[in-house]
């Protein structure tokens, strides 16, 4: 029986990825988080160029905070405070 080969890209290489993601955190843990659907500037911090919401592993939000953010972004899109898709991608 042949020994199993390890697939390329598996193993110790993941540590550098986690360090890179840790430096991209958007919110400090000490600050109280409140999302208002009318606050366009604050919501746009959590939306990328394509109009997609940035995931929690990058933003550093808790599950509860990410859920509040999701509802605020969806409501702001519904009321046309922020666009669903950026003008570049239409």
Curated annotation (Swiss-Prot):
What biological processes does GO assign it? Answer: translation
Q: Which GO terms describe its cellular component?
A: cytosolic small ribosomal subunit
Keywords in UniProt for this one?
Answer: Ribonucleoprotein, Ribosomal protein, RNA-binding, rRNA-binding
Q: InterPro entries annotated for this entry?
A: Ribosomal_bS18, Ribosomal_bS18_sf
Instruction: Give the SUPFAM superfamilies listed for this entry.
Output: Ribosomal protein S18
The disulfides recorded in the entry are none
What Gene Ontology molecular-function terms does this entry list?
small ribosomal subunit rRNA binding; structural constituent of ribosome
Chain intervals for the UniProt region annotation (Disordered): 1-24
Q: How does it assemble?
A: Part of the 30S ribosomal subunit. Forms a tight heterodimer with protein bS6.
Function summary: Binds as a heterodimer with protein bS6 to the central domain of the 16S rRNA, where it helps stabilize the platform of the 30S subunit.
Annotated family:
Belongs to the bacterial ribosomal protein bS18 family.
Task: Quote the HAMAP family the UniProt record gives.
Answer: Ribosomal_bS18
Name assigned to this protein: Small ribosomal subunit protein bS18
């Amino acid at each position: 029986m042949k020994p199993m080969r390890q697939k390329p890209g598996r193993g110790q290489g993941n540590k550098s990825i986690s360090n890179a993601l840790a430096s991209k955190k958007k919110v400090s843990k000490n600050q109280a988080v409140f999302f208002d659907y009318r606050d366009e500037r604050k919501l746009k911090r959590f939306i990328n160029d394509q109009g997609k919401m940035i995931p929690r592993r990058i933003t550093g939000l808790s599950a509860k905070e990410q859920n509040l953010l999701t509802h605020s972004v969806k409501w702001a899109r519904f009321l046309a405070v922020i666009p669903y898709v950026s003008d570049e991608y239409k």
